[in-house]
From Swiss-Prot:
It is an enzyme of class 2 (transferase). It catalyses: S-ubiquitinyl-[E2 ubiquitin-conjugating enzyme]-L-cysteine + [acceptor protein]-L-lysine = [E2 ubiquitin-conjugating enzyme]-L-cysteine + N(6)-ubiquitinyl-[acceptor protein]-L-lysine. GO terms for molecular function: DNA binding; transferase activity; zinc ion binding. GO terms for biological process: protein ubiquitination. It comes from Bovine herpesvirus 4 (strain DN-599). Zn(2+) 1 binds at residues 132, 135, 157, 160. The keyword Transcription applies. Keywords: DNA-binding, Early protein, Membrane, Metal-binding, Transcription, Transcription regulation, Transferase, Transmembrane, Transmembrane helix, Ubl conjugation pathway, Zinc, Zinc-finger. InterPro entries: Znf_RING-CH, Znf_RING/FYVE/PHD. This is Probable E3 ubiquitin-protein ligase IE1. Zn(2+) 2 binds at residues 147, 149, 173, 176.
């Protein structure tokens, strides 16, 4: 028959455990240990009615505490997503409460401002005003518009546009691709371009003198041939003089043409462009 002490049950877990006679406790050693750790256990949300071995109770409590802390800790991916820098342009969702409870963390979606470049451009336009898109000068801008561009690209000086067309060779707007109404007219009122140096002027003038000399030789040979052929008497020597003269003029003219092409061809094109007056009719006003 079991002794009286062995029949005593723990008032907490009802296990057959003898009480401690010195202190008079009516709980087993396991329940006494749990009771001492009760404040710490309550913070970790651990069930105090653990049926495991007493020797493993402390380790089990520690493992449960670690697992509970891991559940409350956000993952790396969530932390990277949530803790993104807050942008001034981001908007707060409508479903979020205005007065969050204490300890509650609210995360707001980060939205990139799509119109930041447009806003900056618009502010610069408002500050600087109207400007020519070629020279960036806002003085004496004409009211005429030469293409279908709007905004800051519609303003342009006529002289700036003429220079741009002559230098680039384009005959339409590079933004809206609208063809310019360009009228070219050759004018002999201008002299040599002022941006030519002394060497350019000398080569250009010498080239025209050479062309005039060749043309004069052709004309003289032609009239001499007419005089010889129309005469009643002409010798073989007269015919050879005419043929030889024409051959020499032909060779000299060919060589001079090559010289003109390689030496003053660029100068001749510059002179033609300089002598040509370019007028651009406005597309709208």
């Amino acid at each position: 028959m079991a002794s009286k002490d062995s029949d005593v049950r723990c008032v907490k877990c009802q296990s057959l455990k003898p009480t401690t006679p010195l202190t008079g406790q009516d709980r087993c050693a396991r329940c006494v240990a749990i009771n001492e750790l009760k404040p710490w256990i309550s913070t970790c949300n651990i069930n105090p009615c653990y049926d495991g071995d007493l020797s493993e109770s402390n380790e089990t409590i520690e493992m449960m505490d670690i697992n509970s802390c891991r559940e409350d800790t956000p993952s790396d991916a969530e932390s990277e997503t949530r803790f993104m820098p807050f942008v001034a342009h981001s908007k707060q969702p409508k479903h979020t409460s205005k007065n969050p409870t204490k300890g509650e963390i609210q995360y707001f979606p980060v939205e990139k401002c799509k119109d930041i470049h447009r806003v900056e451009n618009q502010s610069s336009i408002d500050e600087e005003g109207k400007q020519c898109w070629i020279c960036r000068d806002g003085e004496s801008l004409p009211e005429a518009r030469y293409c279908n561009c709007y905004g800051d690209l519609q303003y342009c000086h006529e002289e700036c546009l003429k220079t741009w067309i002559s230098m680039s060779g384009e005959k339409k707007c590079k933004f809206c691709q609208t063809p310019y109404k360009v009228n070219r007219q050759l004018s002999l009122k201008r002299g040599l371009p002022g941006y030519w140096d002394r060497d350019d002027r000398f080569v250009f003038i010498a080239g025209f003198i050479g062309m005039g000399t060749i043309l004069a030789g052709w004309i003289a040979s032609f009239f001499y041939l007419l005089v010889v052929l129309c005469g009643k008497y002409f010798t073989y020597k007269d015919v050879m003089i005419v043929v030889g003269g024409l051959a020499i003029i032909q060779v000299v003219g060919l060589m001079f043409s090559l010289f003109m092409y390689f030496q003053i061809g660029n100068l001749l094109r510059q002179y033609i462009n300089y002598m040509t007056e370019t007028n651009i009719d406005p597309l709208r006003t």
